[in-house]
Amino acid sequence: MVRSTAHAARRPEPGGTAGGRVEAGGSGSAAGPRPGRGPGLVACHVIAWRNADSRYPFLWEEGVGSQPAARWHAEGEGPVQYLSDTPDGAWAEFLRHEDIRDPEELSYVRRSLWAVDIGSEHLASAELPAETLTGDAGSYSACREEARRHRSAGSSGLMARSAALMPGAAGGWRVDAGLQPGAERDGQTIVLFGGRPDLTGWRAVFEGRPDVTLLAAVRFLS
């Protein structure tokens, strides 16, 4: 996730708040000073990333089409929105599910990448073993039950380790005498329950593809 203001607080870690919840953007969502924070500080919004077919919107809508079942929802439980905390994570989700492993096949990809302001969502933390969070379709049942548990408790969504990225593969890059790998960290998937007409997105890429080097960072289904 990317903070959309320059005065953001440190990124919260998954499960970093009491009660198994993750604050995705701090305690306020308005772009103005927070009470008790002092002058010159502003609330920060959180940018998440969504990969989508360029012919369609970046989120699923209520009553528009039938969303296929996926890790965190069964058939008929949508809409559920799936986003990633990094652009690489969003691309990896697509590559994993389409089983694109060949660099030559990658050259034909034309997809949109959206930057989505998810504000200050207070997300539940998925409390499942790593092998369940990152497993194949056989692990989906347990993940769906976990999503139902949080949804019935009133959560607007949850955050979980990315199933599509290998461990440590969400580190990105930094510039120091040229491009250097960033510090290793695990990617996160952001799951939002229901239609979300309140969210704003920007098309960062209209018809593009990821760098071929990302293929080595993808955890494929088999």
Task: Give the role of each language-model region.
Residues 2-3, 13-15, 19-75, 97-222:
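Active-site and NAD+-binding cores of ADP-ribose-processing enzymes
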Residues 10:
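An N-terminal RHG(E/S)-centered segment typical of histidine phosphatases
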Residues 75-85:
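A short, exposed loop/beta-hairpin motif centered on an aromatic-Gly-Thr core
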Residues 86-87, 91-97:
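A short, charged, amphipathic alpha-helix used as a generic interaction element across diverse proteins
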